[in-house]
Every structure is written in C-alpha cells, then in structure tokens.
Amino acid sequence: MLHLIASLKNLMMKNYHGLVLVLVIVLASGAAQEALGAAAVKQRTFSSPEEGVRALVDAAKSNDTKELLNILGPEAKSLIESGDPVSDRATRERFVTSYYEEANKLVKSGDSKMVLQTGKDDWPFPIPLVKENDRWRFDTSAGKEEIINRRIGRNELDVIQVCLAIVDAEREYYQRDPDGDSLLQYAQKFISTKGKRDGLYWETKPDEQPSPLGPLVARARGEGYKGAGGKPIPYHGYYYKLLTGQGKDASGGAYDYLVRGKMMGGFGMVAYPAQYGSSGIMTFIVNHDGVVYQKDLGAKTASVAQSMTKFNPDKTWTPVKQ
C-alpha cells in the first residue's frame, strides 16, 4: 500500500517542465468547454509584451477561460483539452505560483519576437509574443506543435507510473482478500459494486483501511465512467482496462486468468490515450509480472485497445525503461 500511495503522490508532485504550458489553455469543466466552442474569437493585442504577459497571468490566476481564449486566440481552441481537468487545474495554478512568481523575464528573439521565461531554470513559454503593426500578440500557431508534444510526453510518463501503481493495487487486493471469501484472487474491475469490495476501489469510512486504488484512477476505466457532462473521465489523458488472460507471447504462454469465474491466475491491463495524437500516442500494457510494454496502435488505437481481452506482448511491443 505504501508503494502505491508513494507512486500516486509522486505523480501529483512532479514538476515536469512540460506541465506548465497547459495551465493557461485548458478548461476547468465540461460546461466551460461548451461555452468556448460557441463563436469565433478575435484575438486580443497589446501595446507591449509586458502588458500581454500581465494579462495572461491575471487570467490564469482568476481561471478566466473566456479571457484566456481572447488572449491566445482562436488557435487555442484545439489545445484546450488535455484529457484530465483535475490535473489541468492544478497545473494552471502551479504555473503562477511555482514558476511565474518564482522568477520571470522577457527575452528578445529577433526584432519582433519576445519569449517569456519563468522559474529558476528559465523555462521558455512555448507561445512567443510577436509584434505586428506596432501591437503585440501571442503567436499560438507557432507553439501549437510544441504544446501538444509536451502534453503527450508528460501524460505518457505519468501513465507508466499509473500502470505500476495498479499492479501494486492488484497485488494488495490479492493479499488482503477484501471480499472475505477465503479465496485469494485479483480484482476483475476497478470500481466495486455498491456495498461490496469486488473491485480495486470502494468507499471507506475515516477509521477504515483505504481501498487499494484511488477513485480518480478507478473512474478512468475503459468502459467509461460517466462524469457530469456524460462523458468518460480520463486519468492523465488515458483510459484503463483490465485483461482476463494472456497470449502465447507472454511469459508462461497462453492461458486464462479466470478460474471458475475468479481471477486467480494473474491479471493484465491496457492503458490507451483518450485522444490519440492529443493526449497520448503510445498504448501501454502490463500484467502481474510488473513489466510495462508500449506500442503505437495508430489512428484506430481506441477500437483496438477496447477489443483487447488478453495481455500478449509480441515482438511489436517494446519494454519500457522503468
């Protein structure tokens, strides 16, 4: 349990440089996302780069998503969804408190371009300010690819740790026998049936031992936990699905993990991006041995991953360095 808690805590505390950029362009809720899609927005311009930066930081502080879109322009619409609104909100706050307020400066890059650098490491904000007709604006299109690449990199690093945390959770579940039937088995689902402990997560009272898995990870299961907007909620931009068997390319050969309806022979899992090319590229698989593999499943990632029932890391899957 301690390893699991530490793994998830580390995910929340990591300050990857690539995390910072998302804070100013992601939305806090599904309702805000719908509002942003309404009408074309004319981008705001500024009399100086300093004025532009102040406006950006003020909008981030106040979580004013409408003003952020005005500042960054219509190009920002396609960058708004990172796949995890909870993480996005925390990242946005961290940009202001841990980076901008720690240190900030504008660095000249040519006669008509300025780049905002923040934090003690002078992290460059990926969207530069450019001068046009004696006015300054954020050139979102110039930073678009970099933003997506950094988001994907951050998510994929986090998801590898989530995979290992789920392995820990399954092992703990097996040892604890939480359903009390005296049969040591792994959980077949992430969220328990109401009133039962047949999944990796269940609600507990303050004086009770926590369930092996936290609610945020559990609700990102592939079959689709429905949030307030009626859509599944990813965790670090990914969905997760448990597998009930393994194929011939897995260690030990092909066999089912289920024995008379109980998952006693092992467990497997697949993690795939909620939005291929935006929240992630790689799909990850892992089983009870704890070795994570990755593969780019291409444009049909979601349908391929959703149809998976067995853990089968053939030669097209690559082990992840852990």
Show which residues each predicted segment covers.
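Bacterial N-terminal signal peptides
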Residues: V20-G30
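Flexible, glycine-rich surface segments
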Residues: Y173-S278
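C-terminal soluble interaction/assembly domains
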Residues: G265-Q322
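N-terminal secretory signal peptides that target proteins for export/translocation
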Residues: M1-N15
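Short, low-complexity N-terminal intrinsically disordered segments enriched in polar/charged residues
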Residues: L36-S62, G143-D168, E172
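Short beta-strand edge/turn micro-motifs at domain boundaries
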Residues: K113-L157, Q161-L164, V291-K295
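Surface-exposed, charged secondary-structure patches
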Residues: A76-F125, G229, I233-P234, Q246-K248, ...
